[in-house]
Amino acid sequence: MARPRPREYKAGDLVFAKMKGYPHWPARIDELPEGAVKPPANKYPIFFFGTHETAFLGPKDLFPYKEYKDKFGKSNKRKGFNEGLWEIENNPGVKFTGYQTIQQQSSSETEGEGGNTADASSEEEGDRVEDGKGKRKNEKGGSKRKKSYTSKKSSKQSRKSPGDEDDKDCKEEENKSSSEGGDAGNDTRNTTADLQKAGEGT
């Protein structure tokens, strides 16, 4: 099917929006709230159904919802996609709740501080908008765990009596945090050496 020429959209138009790494997502051309970051030239503020994320996209990445419903409107395993299909059909006027909380914050800050709230609310808004669908990407990364140095300590300590070692653990943590700036490798070696000395002392 030939791709249509980019067209003009207005606030409230329902579309499928395409972002790299994601399927064509059910979305709406959004109106800009007061104090929000202005979009770059030739880009529209987009509200994604299902996830309630926002982004700025050009007309070449937008497809009219009614015309492309059969092509892109099939259910998908992607988190939030099926909810988005339901929302665009049953609740197309759903609002992004973050706008309301930002407006409430800015009005309370104006009363309390007397002024510079437009900058604060636009910064918060800008972070959300710049992320676009970034939160969905980061959800995968959030479940990863970082390795910690405590796994070596706990395996050695589990061989010793737990009651005596609790006090030593606290002292070792204090020593470790108060030690003068060394690199992470030296800190680990010192901790291991301290454990060996502590084991010999008991």
UniProtKB/Swiss-Prot annotation:
Claim: Nucleus is one of the keywords in the record: yes
Domain PWWP positions: 11-68
Basic residues bias spans: 134-159
Region of interest (Disordered), ranges: 90-202
Gene Ontology process terms (BP): microtubule polymerization; negative regulation of microtubule depolymerization; neuron projection development
Positions where Phosphothreonine occurs in the chain: 110
Localisation per UniProt entry: Nucleus
Residue ranges of the motif Nuclear localization signal: 135-147
InterPro entries for the chain: PWWP_dom
Location of Phosphoserine modifications: 121-122, 161
Pfam families reported in the protein's UniProt record: PWWP
Composition-biased stretches (Basic and acidic residues): 168-177
Function: Enhances DNA synthesis and may play a role in cell proliferation.
Descriptive protein name: Hepatoma-derived growth factor-related protein 3
